[in-house]
Design a protein with these regions (language model features):
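Phosphate-binding glycine-rich loop
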Residues: 1-25, 33-42, 49-51
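Short beta-strand->loop structural element characteristic of the AMP-binding/adenylate-forming
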Residues: 46-55, 231
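Active-site phosphate-binding strand-loop segment of PLP-dependent enzymes
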Residues: 55-125, 129-135, 141-147
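Active-site C-terminal subdomain of aminotransferase-like
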Residues: 143-181
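Conserved glycine-rich beta-strand-loop-beta hairpin in the small C-terminal domain of fold type I
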Residues: 170-173, 177-191, 198-212
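Conserved PLP cofactor-binding pocket of PLP-dependent enzymes
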Residues: 216-252, 276-279
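Proline-centric
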Residues: 251-263
């Protein structure tokens, strides 16, 4: 596979689509970042939003297999940076629909600088400000050898500008070690102090720490009132997508990066626990 770099993952995706003249419909999860949808539409593709699978919170696999014959591309997102190998699903899609293009969006995962092979046509990682490893910008991609790649000038969309970004592997690995260590310190606090019943499984806790509570907005407001950042996930882009909508309604993303200290993480748990049986 070819190693690609750009200022943003959306730029890598856009270049890939335009240079290879890819058109048609894209299947993508309903909780996708809206910037990705903008990129796809700007490249001239249409989109179909698919609900999430309850057991892994990624795009619903049976729905993808049912709709794939009407699509030219599937964009698979590793929800909340879940570190799991979905290659068997990709191979199943490819076996039933050989012509479909597969983009493996791992932008919330820990970047890998040594991807030698994948059943996906394009694998994306990001090192932007809100991602797992924050280098202040930049993206890494791996492209199957059969595809072409080149820079495409974009005049109208600031999300896709051609800013120069150079990959520094040494800097990336140094950052990764420090980031992982800090995240684990904060995650240890969250795991120990918060009820296990409201925590998502560990596979979803690398990028941020996720909990599910019935009074999401009140908890977020209480945290922010003390200067502790917290977010809810993206809303579903299709109201019929129940699992994605439920995550938007009940999930809270607790920060575990350099923005937060261990003292703040402890205080966040105290605030959440103060809601008592409501959480």
């Amino acid at each position: 596979m070819k190693l690609l770099t750009a200022n943003r993952a959306n730029k890598l995706l856009y270049n890939f689509l335009k240079v290879n003249h890819i058109t048609g419909n894209v299947l993508l999860p309903a909780n996708i970042c809206p910037d990705v949808v903008t990129t796809l539409h700007h490249a001239g593709l249409t989109t179909t939003f698919v609900d999430l699978q309850a057991d892994n919170l990624c795009i619903h696999q049976e729905t993808v297999l049912a709709l794939a014959k009407q699509a030219s591309l599937m964009l698979f997102v590793h929800t909340y940076g879940i570190e799991h190998d979905f290659y068997s699903f990709f191979e199943q899609v490819r076996e039933q629909h050989p012509e479909i293009i597969i983009v493996d969006d791992k932008c919330l995962c820990l970047p890998d600088l040594d991807v030698k092979d994948s059943p996906a046509d394009l694998v994306l990682y990001s090192t932007g400000e809100t991602k797992m490893v924050n280098l202040g910008g930049g993206a890494i991609g791996y492209l199957a050898d059969k595809w072409q790649y080149d820079e495409v000038e974009v005049e109208e969309n600031a999300l896709l500008t051609n800013e120069l970004w150079l990959l520094d592997p040494k800097q990336l690995y140094l950052k990764m070690d420090a980031i992982i260590a800090h995240k684990e310190k904060l995650n240890t606090i969250y795991r120990a102090l918060l009820p296990e019943t409201i925590q998502l499984p560990d596979a979803y806790q690398h990028w941020r720490f996720h909990i599910l509570v019935p009074n999401q907005q009140q908890v977020i407001e209480a945290l922010r009132a003390e200067g502790i950042p917290a977010e809810c996930p993206y809303p579903a882009l299709d109201d019929a997508c129940v699992v994605a909508n439920n995550l938007h309604t009940y999930a809270i993303q607790l920060y575990n990066d350099k923005q937060l200290t261990q003292e703040q993480a402890t205080r966040a748990c105290e605030i959440i626990l103060a809601f008592g049986k409501e959480v």
